[in-house]
Every structure is written in structure tokens, then in C-alpha cells.
UniProtKB/Swiss-Prot annotation:
Stored Pfam families: TENA_THI-4
pH profile of the protein: Activity is lost at pH 6.
Effect of F47Y: Activity remains very low with 4-amino-5-aminomethyl-2-methylpyrimidine as substrate, and the catalytic efficiency is even decreased by 33-fold
Active site: C135, E207
Disulfide bond sites: none
Subunit structure: Homotetramer.
Name of the featured protein: Aminopyrimidine aminohydrolase
Source taxon at top rank: Bacteria
Native source species: Helicobacter pylori
Gene Ontology terms, MF aspect: thiaminase activity
GO CC annotations on file: cytosol
Lineage of the species this protein comes from: Bacteria, Pseudomonadati, Campylobacterota, Epsilonproteobacteria, Campylobacterales
Keywords of this entry: Hydrolase, Thiamine biosynthesis
Other observations noted: H.pylori is expected to possess a reduced thiamine biosynthetic pathway. Some enzymes involved in de novo thiamine biosynthesis in other organisms, such as ThiO, ThiS and ThiG, are missing in this species. The very acidic environment of the stomach makes the accumulation of formylaminopyrimidine very unlikely because it is mainly a base-degraded derivative of thiamine; formylaminopyrimidine is the precursor identified in a thiamine salvage pathway in Bacillus species.
Length: 217
């Protein structure tokens, strides 16, 4: 079994909790209060800036030019493509640049990004790849799940979010991360794989806490 599938199987419980969370279901059914989503967009904007820094560690830790380029491209994708989803809602919700500049990450947000950065700093390229994977992969799974709800993709407000995270372009980015981790772990020991599982499950749990933080706002 490939390492990515092992991690995926072990994350099913917490990912199921994420999918069924009222914040996520509110996006899919178009019933989520806009003020909660507005708070989420601001916090996720701050998150993405730190998330990109974890990918930057991939450039530092990479042992060959090809992987360095791939991580560099991933940073560009976060700041240009994924951030475009946020910029759409920043305009829609009339969030000002001053608001973004003055916003502070919540404890859950800061703890999540600090954990990823810490694991990336002290680990190898494998730990970096594992640390960033659950965010993108779980978002893809969530968006694909929500896209099956009747009329969710056509929703005037939340449809853009679901389309963005269930798109072929976003799926390609996630697949790159999955394939990279699998290629890096072909000769990994059981102990090394269990450490990667710990990182993957912990970041998945942080994903749940992030949804809950936004819902409780």
C-alpha cells in the first residue's frame, strides 16, 4: 500500500467530521451565515500566507532541482490561483486591505500554521510534504462531496467556493502532493511512516478545529 493511501485510510474519521460540520454543510446547502463566512475568509487569507511558507521549506529541503521547482510552483499556485478564490470573496464581502492587514490569526489558526512550520523545520522534505497534504486533500474531498448536493454548484454565493476547490486545476495540485509523498517514501521505514501519519492526522484535526473556529465566530 502506498503511504498516501495509508494516511488517507487513517484520516477517514476526522475528515468525515469535517464534512458533516455545520459550517461545511452550510456552504453546501447555502445556509451558512455570511458573517461567519466573512470571518473564515479573513482567517483563511492569513492562513494561506503562512501555508505558503511551509512550501518554501520544501524548496530549502529539496535535494534536486526538479523538486525545488515543483515546490516553487506550488507557492505561486497558492498565492495566485488559490488566493484568487479568496480575492473573489474579499471583493464580494467588501473586506478592505486595512482589515486584512490589521487582522490577527486566532489561536487555532496560529497553532495550526506553527505546527506545520515546526515539523517542516525539524524534519526532512518528507515531513514537509506530509505537513501540507491534509489541507489541500481534505478541501478537495469536501468540495467534491458538497458538489453532489443539488444546486450547490449553482449557488449564487457559495457555488464559487465549491467550484474552485473541486476543480480539475485544484485536483492536479493535490495529486502532485500525493505523488510526491509516495515517491519520497518508497524506502521509508515503518517508524518513519508512523511519524508521517502522526503529522497527517494532527493537521487533519487542525482542519476540523479551523472549521469549528469559523463556525463559533
Amino acid at each position: 500500500m502506498q503511504v498516501s493511501q495509508y494516511l488517507y485510510q487513517n484520516a477517514q474519521s476526522i475528515w468525515g467530521d469535517c464534512i458533516s460540520h455545520p459550517f461545511v454543510q452550510g456552504i453546501g446547502r447555502g445556509t451558512l451565515e455570511r458573517d461567519k463566512f466573512r470571518f473564515y475568509i479573513i482567517q483563511d487569507y492569513l492562513f494561506l500566507l503562512e501555508y505558503a511558507k511551509v512550501f518554501a521549506l520544501g524548496v530549502v529541503k529539496a535535494c534536486d532541482e526538479a523538486v525545488m521547482r515543483e515546490f516553487s510552483n506550488a507557492i505561486q499556485d497558492i498565492l495566485n490561483n488559490e488566493m484568487s478564490i479568496h480575492n473573489h470573496y474579499i471583493r464580494e464581502l467588501q473586506i478592505t486591505q486595512k482589515e486584512l492587514q490589521n487582522a490577527c490569526p486566532t489561536l487555532a489558526n496560529k497553532s495550526y500554521t506553527s505546527y506545520m512550520l515546526a515539523e517542516g523545520f525539524k524534519g526532512s522534505i518528507k515531513e514537509v510534504a506530509a505537513a501540507v497534504l491534509s489541507c489541500g486533500w481534505s478541501y478537495l474531498v469536501i468540495a467534491q462531496n458538497l458538489s453532489q448536493i443539488p444546486n450547490a454548484l449553482e449557488h449564487a454565493f457559495y457555488g464559487h467556493w465549491i467550484k474552485g476547490y473541486s476543480s480539475k486545476e485544484f485536483q492536479a495540485c493535490v495529486n502532485w502532493n500525493i505523488n510526491l509523498l509516495d515517491s519520497l517514501t518508497l524506502a521509508s521505514s515503518k517508524q518513519e511512516i508512523e511519524k508521517l501519519k502522526e503529522i497527517f492526522i494532527t493537521t487533519s484535526e487542525y482542519e476540523y478545529l479551523f472549521w469549528d473556529m469559523a463556525y463559533q465566530s
